[in-house]
Amino acid sequence: MTLAEFWPLCLRRLHDMLPHGQFAQWIAPLTVGEEGGVWVVYGKNQFACNMLKSQFAGKIEAVREELAAGRSAFVFKPGEGVCYEMAAVEGAVEPAEPSLHAGSEEMPVQEVLLDELPSEEPVKPAASKTAADILAERMRNLPHEPRQAAGSASRPESAAVAKARTDAQRDAEEARYEQTNLSPDYTFDTLVEGKGNRLAAAAAQAIAESPGQSYNPFFLYGSTGLGKTHLVQAVGNELLKNRPDAKVRYMHSDDYIRSFMKAVRNNTYDVFKQQYKQYDLLIIDDIQFIKGKDRTMEEFFYLYNHFHNEKKQLILTCDVLPAKIEGMDDRLKSRFSWGLTLELEPPELEMRIAILQKKAEAAGISIEDEAALFIANLIRSNVRELEGAFNRVGASSRFMNRPVIDIDLARTALQDIIAEKHKVITADIIIDAVAKYYRIKISDVLGKKRTRNIARPRQVAMSLTKELTTLSLPSIGDSFGGRDHTTVMHGIRAVAKLREEDPELAQDYEKLLILIQN
């Protein structure tokens, strides 16, 4: 098989394997070539090549071994080669249909199937596709096809007509926002997908296409700033795009509480009930704030039953699992778990970089890869802080009339954050955090035990100390019970390799970074 035959098929396979954002950002722009009989994948610079080798080389090699096993492994280098079109579906060798449980990056789907609904209220099979059907299809076919269709030729229009059309669109958007409280910026097109939100995004799109069916309610939980509001509002915007006549409302739980109390105070309770029962989709953010308010919880219990019985979609967000909401009515905690409950996790490095690049593109600013990597490594905890950091750097770029964000500009704009992170973190803090995380004693981390359950956390702690402090290798060794600097170096290298090969350890490392820095 020649390179010209292989690469279009490889693109198709990678397109089917990877989330759309990853494929579009890293794989689709690649060019390839042949040098001295060796197949070469060209990246635009060394940073891109390093990212390709660490994140995608294994997948590319797996496809090569299957389709062109006689060829040697690919080489990755900066340069420019030939750009090939992706093979059509019928031209590619169809991969085996993956299980919903396959792959370490996907959450176990048995947690979200229909049998979670209580036995006393079984779900009747629908004649049309349910959200469960759509979600299953999406999980089999992730990543999704690009949502924006290619532009087609059209007749030119006058400036006046174009302005009138734009004004009408803006007025319609403003009117829709007033009626629904949805932000037009929160759509699936503006959402960046990664490991932390991939299943939730697929489920949200399925619900937008078939609301009120299997996954009702859709309960999304996670720490602040992870993108819960964006994702749930995207469902509302997508539903209105498909069904402009749908009645949709987004609100914070505080607004619901105030609305209910006003109805009680003004004796307009019946009007209040009818107002909420009219919606086809009701989205309530931070539902945990109704806890401890007995009358509000009682009223919401009846509203919940109405939505469930009428197969109208209810979407709720929270900071914890339903069962962990202290002070919440037990009946509500039980019902919150009837449908689909998913967690949003902090964005991984690749997703953070993609978010920064998308923000830069939207702002009309160019950001160098090294600068994006620097900011993404500096801000790890949540999307909101990451976007805030970018806004600061972007403002500096505009004020200094520098159209390209490089690493020096990023360092200057974020110097107070850099100083704060390095000021408070010590080796002792890291050792304490790692010991608590792995449930071992600090004396074990500092001691001589070499069993796997002790040695691995010790190496993780050494690696974190190297990354989060300014200590030299000998100083790190001193902090870990007087170990030699070569032992520290070996531990750091071992962890770096394991983070590429072991998804569980990589996730542990990311969680520890966030815990220690926050």
From Swiss-Prot:
Keywords (A to Z) from UniProt: ATP-binding, Cytoplasm, DNA replication, DNA-binding, Lipid-binding, Nucleotide-binding
Family from the record: Belongs to the DnaA family.
Cell compartments where the protein resides: Cytoplasm
InterPro entries, A to Z: AAA+_ATPase (IPR003593), Chromosome_initiator_DnaA (IPR001957), Chromosome_initiator_DnaA-like (IPR020591), Chromosome_initiator_DnaA_CS (IPR018312), DnaA_C (IPR013159), DnaA_dom (IPR013317), DnaA_N_dom (IPR024633), DnaA_N_sf (IPR038454)
Biased composition range(s): Basic and acidic residues: 164-177
Region called Domain IV, binds dsDNA, residue ranges: 398-518
Species annotation: Neisseria meningitidis serogroup A / serotype 4A (strain DSM 15465 / Z2491)
Segments for region (Domain I, interacts with DnaA modulators): 1-72
Free-text note regarding domains: Domain I is involved in oligomerization and binding regulators, domain II is flexibile and of varying length in different bacteria, domain III forms the AAA+ region, while domain IV binds dsDNA.
Entry binding sites for ATP: G225, G227, K228, T229
Region annotated Domain III, AAA+ region, chain positions: 181-397
Chain residue ranges for the region called Domain II: 72-180
Region (Disordered): 145-178
Biological process per Gene Ontology, one example term: regulation of DNA replication
Subunit annotation: Oligomerizes as a right-handed, spiral filament on DNA at oriC.
Protein name as annotated: Chromosomal replication initiator protein DnaA
Protein task: Plays an essential role in the initiation and regulation of chromosomal replication. ATP-DnaA binds to the origin of replication (oriC) to initiate formation of the DNA replication initiation complex once per cell cycle. Binds the DnaA box (a 9 base pair repeat at the origin) and separates the double-stranded (ds)DNA. Forms a right-handed helical filament on oriC DNA; dsDNA binds to the exterior of the filament while single-stranded (ss)DNA is stabiized in the filament's interior.
Keyword ATP-binding tagged: yes
One Gene Ontology term, aspect cellular component: plasma membrane
Organism domain of life: Bacteria
Molecular-function GO term, any one: DNA replication origin binding
Main location: cytoplasm
Record lineage: Bacteria, Pseudomonadati, Pseudomonadota, Betaproteobacteria, Neisseriales
Coiled coil (residue ranges): none
NCBIfam families the UniProt entry points to: DnaA (TIGR00362)
